[in-house]
UniProtKB/Swiss-Prot annotation:
It holds the Pfam family Methyltransf_4. Its EC number is 2.1.1.33. The lineage of its organism: Eukaryota, Fungi, Dikarya, Ascomycota, Saccharomycotina. It is found in: Nucleus. The gene is TRM8. This is tRNA (guanine-N(7)-)-methyltransferase. Keywords: Methyltransferase, Nucleus, Phosphoprotein, RNA-binding, S-adenosyl-L-methionine, Transferase, tRNA processing, tRNA-binding. Belongs to the class I-like SAM-binding methyltransferase superfamily. TrmB family. It comes from Saccharomyces cerevisiae (strain YJM789) (Baker's yeast). Gene3D superfamilies: Vaccinia Virus protein VP39. One of its GO terms (cellular component) is tRNA methyltransferase complex. Methyltransferase that catalyzes the formation of N(7)-methylguanine at position 46 (m7G46) in tRNA, a modification required to maintain stability of tRNAs; its absence resulting in tRNA decay. Both the D-stem and T-stem structures of tRNAs are required for efficient methyltransferase activity.
Length: 286
């Protein structure tokens, strides 16, 4: 008889840890951290440990993941993710999401962007279940531990498939920045259609990105870098920004060093290929 994995064995420490974290998530996920009993008692929440959130490195974007998504952006209740920005009188949000990290992984980029852009709501979209849970728990802990300063209230994560449902979440021209950091390279040619940058998807990104907005890309795979640059340069609504612009942009510096994948590449002394593109004005129809 095959033994159960440790994560499913009721007698294991890992199982107990995951059950405890799941209960904490249910309790804290949709409440204002400064109103929780933990903060009132002055307690700190330990940051989650990745080893308890085992997940495959990649997920098939074409599979049916039974994801929840709104019919339209107007049907999305953002107050569950950003309760600090909900108007108590009318129940409406005081801000909209303007920065999106597509395939946010373990959330390192968002966490570094949060204090750098305190006036912007930042959303990470991640398709993998356990990775999303990890980022949720990480944000819960960070919000709790910096409650006196209302820290990290402007970031959150959403389990979603950006290749299928991005326009369901964002209005036309809503975003000012989109990040694609170390995406799945899909090396095999028959898998290239699953890459996050394609001609079709770029038209959707152009729709939700405002004119003058920026698409940020970074990867350690030269072939993928050349693929993304080629497709973005061929698209009529994007234009590459200069190397000088990249060197002086705050987001590029954060993007190079904040993500877990970026740190791994740094440890291995690998290359990081960066390319940034601005959203051009939509041509007038005569």
């Amino acid at each position: 008889m095959k033994a159960k994995p440790l994560s499913q064995d009721p007698g294991s420490k890992r199982y107990a840890y995951r059950i405890n974290k799941e209960e904490n998530r249910k309790e804290l996920k949709h409440v204002k951290i400064n109103e929780s009993s933990l903060v009132q008692e002055g307690q700190k929440i330990d940051l989650p440990k990745k080893r308890y959130y085992r997940q495959r490195a990649h997920s098939n974007p074409f599979s049916d993941h039974q994801l929840e998504y709104p019919v339209s952006p107007q049907d999305m209740d953002w107050s569950k993710l950003y309760p600090y920005y909900k108007n108590a009188e009318n129940g409406q949000m005081t801000k909209k999401v303007t920065i999106a990290d597509i395939g946010c992984g373990f959330g390192g980029l968002m966490i570094d962007l949060s204090p750098a852009f305190p006036e912007d709501l930042i959303l990470g979209m991640e398709i993998r279940v356990q990775v999303t849970n990890y980022v949720e728990d990480r944000i819960i802990a960070l919000r709790n531990n910096t409650a006196s300063k209302h820290g990290f209230q402007n970031i959150n994560v959403l389990r979603g498939n950006a290749m299928k449902f991005l326009p369901n979440f964002f209005e036309k021209g809503q975003l000012s920045k989109m990040f694609f950091c170390f995406p799945d390279p899909h090396f095999k040619q028959r898998k290239h259609k699953a890459r996050i940058i394609t001609n079709t998807l770029l038209s959707e990104y152009a729709y939700v990105l405002k004119e003058g907005g920026v698409v940020y890309t970074i990867t350690d795979v030269k072939d993928l870098h050349e693929w993304m640059v080629k497709h973005l340069e061929e698209h009529p609504l994007f234009e590459r920004l200069s190397k000088e612009w990249e060197e002086n942009d705050e987001c590029v510096q954060i993007m190079r060093n904040a993500t877990e994948e970026g740190k791994k590449v740094e440890r291995k002394k690998g290359d990081k290929f960066v390319a940034c593109f601005t959203r051009l004005p939509t041509p007038a129809i005569l």
